[in-house]
Amino acid sequence: MQESFENSVKNILKIIGEDPNREGLLKTPSRVYKAFKFLTSGYEEDPKEVLNDALFTSSNNEMVLMRNIEFYSLCEHHLLPIIGRVHVAYIPNGKVVGLSKIPRMVNIYARRLQIQEQMTEQIAQALAEVIEPKGVGVVVEARHMCVEMRGVQKINSTTTTSALRGCFIKNADTRREFFSLINSPQETHF
């Protein structure tokens, strides 16, 4: 499979008018293969297993929020980068998940060919199914290089998507608290 991938990269280089045998490009096919292998490594992991591996009983019934989880992904339409951050909140219903598992789950979904809308839904759905909270809120803010580098070429434009479950939909106060917390200034001086 690696050889076929590298040959395809060589062919792309030829098609755009480059010489894949020139010094600067000799190792490019191998580098591109390794880069894509890493950037799509999310297909090799199950995010629900990651979450299930760190569930803990808890009497907490207040919002748990992790914000500014940075990620990068590849747009499934153009294979160009998506760079952004994710805010994830849930209200426990007898269980909490280890905090490190939330960004790990985000990385798993991000390291697949994606569209932002789908990734937002996948994160919310995985949390809802695995920890069965009273509610889940997910907001993703991202820049899309397919918008900035080609087509309309709108540099620094951002896209925001959200997915809400349970009490984040049904309870306006919960929803308002979530959006207020993710939009408040964050200073982390410890």
From Swiss-Prot:
Enzymatic reactions: GTP + H2O = 7,8-dihydroneopterin 3'-triphosphate + formate + H(+)
UniProt keyword terms in alphabetical order: GTP-binding, Hydrolase, Metal-binding, Nucleotide-binding, One-carbon metabolism, Zinc
Annotated Zn(2+) binding sites: C75, H78, C146
Stretches that traverse the bilayer: none
A Pfam cross-reference name: GTP_cyclohydroI
Molecular function terms from GO: GTP binding; GTP cyclohydrolase I activity; zinc ion binding
Enzyme Commission code(s) on record: 3.5.4.16
Stored InterPro entries: GTP-CH-I_C/QueF, GTP-CH-I_N, GTP_CycHdrlase_I, GTP_CycHdrlase_I_CS, GTP_CycHdrlase_I_dom
One of the protein's GO biological processes: one-carbon metabolic process
This protein's record includes keyword Hydrolase: yes
Entry annotated with the keyword Nucleotide-binding: yes
One Gene Ontology cellular component: cytoplasm
Pathway involvement of the protein, from the record: Cofactor biosynthesis; 7,8-dihydroneopterin triphosphate biosynthesis; 7,8-dihydroneopterin triphosphate from GTP: step 1/1
Domain of life of the source: Bacteria
Family classification: Belongs to the GTP cyclohydrolase I family.
PANTHER family: GTP CYCLOHYDROLASE 1 (PTHR11109:SF7), GTP CYCLOHYDROLASE I (PTHR11109)
Assembly description: Toroid-shaped homodecamer, composed of two pentamers of five dimers.
Protein name: GTP cyclohydrolase 1
Record gene name: folE
